[in-house]
Amino acid sequence: MARITVEDCLNQIPNRFKLTLAATYRARELAQGHAPRLDSKDKPTVTALREIASGLTGLEMLRKVPT
């Protein structure tokens, strides 16, 4: 199993606070039943981080949040 690191995710989203928010929102979507964008048998949080590190998910997660 490959390990995911925060540094891999920070290459995609340089601001660690925005990274945390994007990962949280995506993990919540996955936990509610949305389909993952990559094959993963990990928990929603790890899957969200893997998606961010691979560039499949990014700051668009922050634009989807209602204000």
From Swiss-Prot:
It is an enzyme of class 2 (transferase). Pfam families: RNA_pol_Rpb6 (PF01192). One of its GO terms (cellular component) is DNA-directed RNA polymerase complex. Its EC number is 2.7.7.6. One of its GO terms (molecular function) is DNA binding. Keywords: DNA-directed RNA polymerase, Nucleotidyltransferase, Transcription, Transferase. InterPro entries: DNA-dir_RNA_pol_omega, Pol_omega/Rpo6/RPB6, RPB6/omega-like_sf. It catalyses: RNA(n) + a ribonucleoside 5'-triphosphate = RNA(n+1) + diphosphate. One of its GO terms (biological process) is DNA-templated transcription. The RNAP catalytic core consists of 2 alpha, 1 beta, 1 beta' and 1 omega subunit. When a sigma factor is associated with the core the holoenzyme is formed, which can initiate transcription. Belongs to the RNA polymerase subunit omega family. Promotes RNA polymerase assembly. Latches the N- and C-terminal regions of the beta' subunit thereby facilitating its interaction with the beta and alpha subunits. This is DNA-directed RNA polymerase subunit omega. The gene is rpoZ.
